[in-house]
């Protein structure tokens, strides 16, 4: 009974820590979305969303799920209290994120004309995609730093990195959108991703390791489990990312960029803002589950506890969105975005079933 109460407290503690971070991130995201809605309108939001969904799809294809699988390897190494073992796993992870990051960069750069044609129906955005290819490398390297912090249970550092990254990203984006309007979207995405990398790296370097030589053979041997498990874990995420991209690309090709912007706005309210609750909870959940994965009884108990708390938190939030949907849309965006009210109400119902 005492262990159960302690587990609930741990879940609430981690969720509160990252819940606070996510609330702050939501505020930053709301401000950014409001600025885009006012300065760039639905068209600007549509273009930004298409760029993001396209690079996310390529990233999902090339990152091999290291952002998830490597947490387990680092958590297991941490449990051994063997500094040599920990340093070896960290070294392998850092090599893998560089390799997979460059893979994403090269693939996006080479396929830029095709991506532009598929996404926008023309090749006018080829140069933009080639510039954005560098964000695939920055994002994967940032993911590697975050995995290190999460696996080593340095959750406060991870929270601080996310907080600072959100603020810096906003401060970078606003002037670019104000002065360059739609032309500022690509520079804002590139500079923001680079800033996030620098911030995450500044925190991860505080984790002390011992000098360790890791051969190419050891890198392949150690990295094989990360890549194999990561690829399997990433399949479900890849399907979700691909579906998100296909929907946006379809809307872009059959409708207009304004329609894509409206869809992005509706999805952001439920899928991103409310969905951040799941992100906050998963930050502590996965490392804890990895630590007890061999004990089916404890793993089952932890999963049930996590589901109960998810319903407890998300239920009231969804009720608020359902009641004040129209007011929320006008406040978060503008009157131009009111057609998404129906979408929000149906999405809220789906989000509840996701929590259950």
Where do the protein language model's features map onto the residues?
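N-terminal membrane topogenesis motif
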Residues: 1-29, 51, 83-92, 216-236, ...
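C-terminal transmembrane helix end/exit motif
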Residues: 2, 35, 70, 146-151, ...
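Alpha-helical transmembrane segments of multi-pass membrane transporters/permeases
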Residues: 12-25, 129-135, 148-174, 186, ...
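Helix-terminus/linker motif at the lipid-water interface of multi-pass membrane proteins
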Residues: 30-45, 116-119, 238-273, 288-291, ...
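Alpha-helical transmembrane segments of polytopic membrane transporters and translocases
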Residues: 34-35, 46-63, 92-95, 135, ...
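Helix-loop junctions and terminal segments of transmembrane helices
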Residues: 64-80, 151, 266, 270-314
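Alpha-helical transmembrane segments of multi-pass membrane transport and lipid-handling proteins
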Residues: 91-120, 171, 178, 277, ...
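Hydrophobic alpha-helical transmembrane segments
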Residues: 130, 159-208, 225, 265-267
